[in-house]
Amino acid sequence: PDYLGFASAIEMAPARPADFKRAMALKRVSTELCLSVGGREINAVTAAVGGFRSVPTKARLEALLDSVKNAKADAVETARLFGSLDYPAFERRTQYFSLKNYLVSGKEVVLNSFGRNAKTWKASGKKFFEEVSEEVVDGSTAKKHAFGGKPYLTGALARVNNNFSFLSDDAREVALESSIRFPSFTPFANNFAQAIELVHFLDEATELIEELIPKIRVEPLHALEFRKATGRALSEAPRGVLYHEYSLDERGMVRDARIITPTQQNVRNIEEDLKALLRELIASASAQRAGGPPNQVRRSLPKQKLVAEIEKLVRAYDPCFSCAAHFLELKLNKIK
């Protein structure tokens, strides 16, 4: 809606019914997949040590395979739509953080600034905290994170930038149809990267389901033996790399837990992008008023335009449900 002139998806639906129907169809397929394995639409409840408490039947997998294959055309058209949108001409290079080789859960992570050699290391919790700093700051309920004292970005754009050659053939093909090239340094391209990933992960789902159908079976989960220990992992969530760590006592009770979400890691980078974007908007408005009356900058950069561009940038990161809405109240202080 941001790029097509609508205030919301609901407003867009009557004007662009085909696009809206494709989006709803893709949402239905993702819901089917999550329900079949995780037990509900979001935040799976069936995961257990060593597997899942609910395993889809062969018949269910065959039905899912049909749904996934049928969704492929919708995903490709959606990616083409996002690749054709008129994104703001704004760039700010940062550090791009993802797992290596397009794995969802893996042993190596990549930090790439595309100005120097990419940094790759084993995804251990100890190494993560040697590299990442956490800081509590005034005026924010979220901690600020940095690599080497600098902000970084995680999520779809980081994954596509770092692992473009590991995309599925069709995902890579639809990406190359667009004028946007990867690595891309505009945060607005994150939404296009997400659309590319729709194609990639439908291809991944097809391969996984086809592999599972002939050998799916229900097996009892292994009996657990409790002991005092700490476990940690890095995995890719849709919004980026998730770090989680748990310390258990001798009875298997969680005594300490540490979770660092992708949105939390992106907060500092969002703020740096906003600062840079505002500087560009103000500079552009100032250039427009050159030689004109003093109040022309105010006319060429109205408050409504500022709010729209700021919200568009925040939504490009897809940080949460609430941030997908129109949320910003902007207070302007005029300096004479």
Region locations from a protein language model:
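Active-site bordering "gate/hinge" segments
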Residues: P1-R239, T261-R289, N295-K336
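Short, acidic, Ser/Thr-enriched surface-loop or helix-capping motifs
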Residues: D249
